[in-house]
């Protein structure tokens, strides 16, 4: 990679990470070194979502190097999500006794999370003291790259920077108490994102495989693919941008594909999305 400036709108076929080196946060491109097969962070000057563009600083660090910590790949101003956007998840919620509705609703069910709910890879997910039933929900998240307002379905993907993994952590025992799900889905640490952003053209977002690992064991009933989304990603962007302005860095949680499950203190939760990577967090009691 040369030192020329890359403008945000032209970012393609890349992985974009946000990391700290000795507690100094910065952005990087993630590259795999063919000589050893390891991932390296190519540090950047500038912000990937800023109009001025970015360019390599000349520094390179191993992703797992000393003093390196991956952060949430963006700090969104807004996070929106879609509930019951897969028929399998809607049926699971009904069979588990969490919903009176057996099938997915015809209209989109959109909720929000505050920006303070966002954490990064390896950050702890904290069970609030007022909950005893916290659940994982593995998903693919959309990261916006341009200001989007009243965009059409046909235009929608032009406004996307890329995709990342997300765990839409939910307090099931509070979800039925608040119609807006504010406490159930908006508590601090309820939105782990990472490990990085894969740019739009470098992911088969129409058929991205999603899976989940709990304490080293694959949870087969939690797996699925974005091919089974009821409301597709362009439709989600068009719908949300019809009532609010989406800014660069804003995040949309596209839906969990199948079953979810309980999390206990000490659990290791890993969301995996084919073509993106793995997002790991450990659960602690607050």
Language model region names:
Residues 116-141:
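A structural-propensity feature for long, helix-poor, extended segments
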Residues 75, 120, 135-137, 247, ...:
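Residue-level recognition of short, solvent-exposed, well-ordered loop/turn junctions
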Residues 98-120, 136, 270-274:
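Structural signature of FAD isoalloxazine-binding scaffolds in flavoprotein oxidoreductases
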Residues 92-93, 121-124, 129-130, 151-156, ...:
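A short secondary-structure junction signal
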Residues 59-63, 69-72, 89, 170-286:
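Catalytic-pocket segment enriched in acidic/His residues
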Residues 6, 69-71, 98-101, 125-134, ...:
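A generic local secondary-structure boundary/capping motif
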Residues 2-104, 108, 201-203, 211, ...:
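N-terminal non-catalytic cap/leader segment that marks the start of a structured domain
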Residues 85, 144-147, 151-166:
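RNA pseudouridine synthases
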């Amino acid at each position: 990679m040369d030192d020329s400036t890359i403008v945000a709108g032209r970012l393609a076929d890349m992985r974009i990470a946000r990391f700290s080196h000795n507690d100094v946060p910065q952005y990087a491109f993630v590259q795999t070194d063919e000589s050893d097969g390891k991932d390296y962070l190519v540090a950047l000057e500038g912000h990937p979502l800023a109009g001025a563009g970015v360019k390599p600083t000349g520094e390179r660090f191993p992703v797992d190097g000393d003093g390196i910590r991956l952060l949430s790949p963006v700090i969104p101003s807004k996070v929106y999500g879609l509930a019951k956007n897969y028929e399998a998840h809607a049926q699971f919620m009904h069979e588990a006794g969490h919903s009176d509705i057996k099938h997915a609703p015809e209209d989109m069910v959109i909720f929000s999370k505050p920006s303070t709910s966002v954490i990064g890879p390896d950050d702890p997910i904290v069970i609030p003291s007022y909950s005893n039933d916290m659940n994982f929900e593995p998903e693919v998240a959309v990261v916006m790259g341009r200001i989007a307002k009243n965009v059409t379905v046909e235009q929608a993907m032009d406004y996307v920077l890329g995709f990342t993994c997300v765990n839409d952590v939910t307090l099931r025992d509070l979800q039925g108490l608040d119609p807006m799900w504010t406490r159930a889905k908006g508590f601090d640490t309820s939105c782990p994102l990472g490990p990085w952003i894969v740019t739009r053209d470098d992911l088969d977002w129409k058929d991205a495989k999603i899976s989940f690992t709990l304490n080293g064991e694959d949870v087969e009933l939690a797996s699925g693919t974005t091919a089974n989304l009821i409301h597709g990603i362009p439709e989600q962007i068009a719908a949300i941008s019809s009532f609010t302005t989406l800014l660069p860095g804003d995040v949309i949680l596209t839906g969990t594909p199948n079953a979810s499950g309980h999390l206990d203190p000490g659990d290791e939760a890993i969301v995996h999305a084919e073509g993106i990577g793995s997002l790991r967090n450990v659960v602690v009691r607050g």
